[in-house]
C-alpha cells in the first residue's frame, strides 16, 4: 500500500491567486510564452508556513506534467541546495514567470510588464504576509530582477529577509561559458552566506559544501509532499523523463514521457 503524503493545495490568498490569474492576453504566444501549457504556480508550502522563499525563472516540460515548478533537473538541484540549508519542507518556490517560455529573447523582456509584474507581486506579498519568511534565494538574473522590482515597492521595502543571488541551477549548459565547477563554486558562496543568516531551519545541519561535481547525495528525491496526489515516485527521483524534440516548435510542442 502506497502511503505517500501529498500537497493538498494552496490556502487563503494563495488559493485565490490560483483561481484568478493572467491569461494569454498577458502571456502571449507571440511574445515567446507557452500559454497553451497553462500556468504552473509554485512548489512547496503555499499555506503561510514557509520560512525560505525560492525564486526561479519559468516552468519547462517536466513541470507541465507534474504541475509544480522546479521538478525536473533544475528542481532536484535546487532541492539539494535547500536541504543543505536544513529546509526539508518549510519553503515556498515561485517563478518570475507563471507560464513556460519557448523563446528567451522574446519573453524575458516582458518580465516587468505591468500585468505580469502585478500578479507576481501578489504572490510575493502573500508569501510575506504571515511574517515567517526569513531568507530569499534568487536563481538566475530574471529571478533576481523580479525580486529587485518587488523590493522597490512599499510592500517590498517593508520586509527585510536575508537575500542572496545565485546562478541558475542549469547555468552550466554544455559548451557554455559557465562550467559545472563555476556553478558549484557560486552555490558554495551562497551556502556560506545563508548558513550564517538562517535562524529557523527545519533541521540544523553543518555546512556541507559542494565538490567539483554533483554527487548522488546532492540530488535528493523531491518530497511527495510537494506534488499532487498520485504522482509516481520515479517522477520525483529521475531527470529527463519528459523531453521535447531538438526542434520543439514554438508555443505548441509535443512532450515525450519515458517511463523508466
Task: Identify the residue ranges that each predicted region occupies.
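A polyanion-binding, active-site-adjacent surface
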Residues: 1-260
Amino acid at each position: 500500500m502506497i502511503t505517500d503524503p501529498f500537497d493538498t493545495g494552496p490556502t487563503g490568498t494563495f488559493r485565490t491567486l490560483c483561481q484568478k490569474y493572467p491569461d494569454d492576453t498577458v502571456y502571449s504566444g507571440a511574445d515567446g510564452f507557452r500559454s497553451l501549457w497553462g500556468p504552473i504556480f509554485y512548489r512547496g508550502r503555499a499555506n503561510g508556513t514557509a520560512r525560505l522563499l525560492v525564486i526561479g525563472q519559468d516552468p519547462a516540460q517536466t513541470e507541465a506534467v507534474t504541475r509544480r515548478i522546479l521538478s525536473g533537473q533544475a528542481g532536484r538541484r535546487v532541492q539539494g541546495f535547500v536541504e543543505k540549508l536544513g529546509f526539508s519542507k518549510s519553503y515556498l518556490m515561485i517563478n518570475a514567470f507563471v507560464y513556460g517560455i519557448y523563446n528567451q529573447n522574446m519573453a524575458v523582456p516582458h518580465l516587468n510588464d505591468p500585468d505580469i509584474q502585478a500578479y507576481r507581486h501578489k504572490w510575493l506579498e502573500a508569501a510575506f504576509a504571515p511574517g515567517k519568511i526569513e531568507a530569499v534565494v534568487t536563481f538566475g538574473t530574471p529571478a533576481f530582477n523580479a525580486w529587485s522590482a518587488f523590493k522597490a515597492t512599499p510592500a517590498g521595502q517593508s520586509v527585510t529577509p536575508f537575500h542572496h543571488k545565485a546562478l541558475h541551477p542549469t547555468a552550466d549548459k554544455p559548451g557554455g561559458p559557465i562550467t559545472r565547477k563555476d556553478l558549484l563554486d557560486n552555490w558554495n558562496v551562497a551556502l556560506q552566506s545563508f548558513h550564517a543568516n538562517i535562524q529557523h531551519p527545519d533541521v540544523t545541519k553543518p555546512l556541507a559544501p559542494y565538490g567539483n561535481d554533483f554527487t548522488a547525495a546532492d540530488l535528493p528525491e523531491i518530497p511527495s509532499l510537494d506534488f499532487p496526489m498520485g504522482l509516481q515516485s520515479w517522477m520525483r527521483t529521475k531527470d529527463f523523463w519528459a523531453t521535447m524534440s531538438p526542434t520543439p516548435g514554438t508555443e505548441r510542442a509535443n512532450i515525450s514521457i519515458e517511463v523508466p
